[in-house]
Amino acid sequence: MKLTTLIPAITTALFLSTSITYAGEIQKMNQTEKDVYSTIENMTDAFHKGDIKGVMGSYEAQATVVFEPNKPASDMDQIRQMFEGAFQMNPAFTYSGHDVIVTGDIALHIAPWQMKGKAPNGTEIVQSGLSVAVLRQQPDSSWHMVIDNPHGQILMENK
């Protein structure tokens, strides 16, 4: 697997992976929005622990993840491999906010992010973007990601 493929994979894997949240944002969320946000935090915790089962459990079986701009992946084996490759770089993500919008059983999570990590050769990697994720409430009331795109900023960059 190429480094150029792994870098976006890391980005995707962690676009939601932060414990850094503005306290006011969470306080302003209603319980349903907090439940959606909790899904994001749980995925992040699993990612930081290298827990592929926990990461994959954050997604519906038919999910699509955009590891590279304009290249969505819907094959769960490929998605698993990309996340496992991303674990190796120990990236650190920071976010400048979280926005959660819910209507019925569908939720949208938006978060600007910055990532710092190291390539296998020790080269520092720094990236930033806008994460956009769509989640669906499950019959057991939990929330799982259906679409995960950490490259939402691409549309603005390519004007």
Where are the predicted features?
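Positively charged n-region of N-terminal signal peptides that target proteins for export
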Residues: 1-5
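N-terminal hydrophobic alpha-helix used for membrane targeting or insertion
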Residues: 7-8, 94
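Bacterial N-terminal signal peptides
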Residues: 8-19
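A beta-strand edge to alpha-helix "cap/lid" segment located at domain peripheries
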Residues: 22-57, 64-159
